[in-house]
Amino acid sequence: MTRREMLTAFCKAGVPENAFWLGKITEAENVNGIAIEGNAWIVYYRSEGQLSNVYHCATQEEACDELFRRIMNVR
């Protein structure tokens, strides 16, 4: 799945495009986001503006699912 496909899937599910970031760690850790480090997909999740959880996932799909669940639980 490409970055554009992930963005499209999240937006179609009702998640605002400015609610998450997919890309570099420096940007992803400052918002709800997914970044790649080595072979790991890392999910950064913020609650009330504070970094509250970091999840290490084995696959892109797992990372997308985790971030999606976190964002949708907040809404």
Model region roles, listed by residue range:
Residues M1-T26:
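Negatively charged, low-complexity tracts enriched in Asp/Glu with abundant Ser/Thr
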Residues M1, S52-A58:
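Short, exposed beta-strand "edge-strand" segments with a Pro/Gly-rich flavor and a Y/T-containing core
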Residues M6, P16-E17, A40-W41, L51, ...:
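A general marker of short, structured functional hotspots
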